[in-house]
């Protein structure tokens, strides 16, 4: 399956005890992603043959290419504080990175366009619990030819209390994909998005269940 599109980077803070999500927000414009899972590699041999093998996933990283690292979005996610600075007659607020910052746990998901010789799909990828890491910055002075630098942010993948670390589903339409993605946050698709894709959110075919992943019967979503 070939990938030919990427969009809809969404996130919401997660309550660690209840594993329910807050408001869903856009992280940034999507440019690229790369998932790197951490796996066990334990093996037991006896009588000259492999008897036990453990390759279970224990976590991982996800690198996200984004079009904007808006500090009003990323600073709170990184657990950064704020400081007031006096500038003439004005008092301005600046974000403060500190060695004691503790990033917030969030759920994160996006939609990937995929295509083969038979059909095109919109695939939902959802990570129920991640944290974002402080990221490096770089830039150049203006030159004769424009050379745009876009940021890359890295998330650390965690499992929920039941061990779930990722959900995905291949959908036939963008509206179905949005419905699944918002359902995994425990939400419904905003009306303006539903109208943009030509249907109402209260349609029986597109209205997602208002449940969070740990409480949702995922057979309904992943079959």
Where do the PLM segments sit?
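An exposure/low-complexity boundary signal
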Residues: 97-99, 218-221
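Solvent-exposed edge beta-strands and adjacent loop segments
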Residues: 1-78, 129-150
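Intrinsically disordered, low-complexity segments enriched in small/polar residues
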Residues: 3, 20, 27, 77-79, ...
């Amino acid at each position: 399956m070939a990938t030919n599109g990427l969009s809809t980077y969404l996130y919401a803070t997660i309550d660690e005890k209840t594993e329910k999500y807050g408001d869903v927000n856009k992280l940034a414009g999507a440019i690229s992603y790369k998932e790197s899972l951490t796996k066990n590699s334990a093996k037991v041999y006896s009588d000259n043959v492999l008897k036990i093998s453990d390759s279970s996933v224990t976590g991982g990283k996800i690198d996200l290419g984004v079009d904007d690292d808006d500090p009003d979005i990323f600073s709170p996610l990184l657990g950064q504080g704020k400081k007031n600075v006096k500038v003439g007659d004005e008092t301005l607020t600046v974000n403060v990175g500190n060695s004691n910052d503790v990033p917030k746990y969030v759920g994160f998901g996006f939609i990937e366009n995929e295509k083969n010789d038979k059909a095109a799909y919109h695939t939902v990828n959802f990570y129920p619990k991640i944290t974002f890491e402080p990221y490096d910055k770089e830039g150049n002075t203006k030159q004769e030819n424009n050379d745009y630098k876009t940021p890359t942010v890295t998330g650390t993948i965690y499992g929920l209390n039941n061990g779930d670390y990722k959900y995905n589903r291949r959908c036939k339409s963008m509206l179905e994909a949005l419905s699944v993605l918002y359902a995994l946050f425990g939400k419904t698709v905003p009306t303006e998005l539903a109208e943009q894709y030509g249907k109402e959110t209260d349609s029986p075919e597109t209205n997602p269940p208002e449940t969070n992943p740990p409480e949702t019967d995922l057979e309904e979503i992943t079959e």
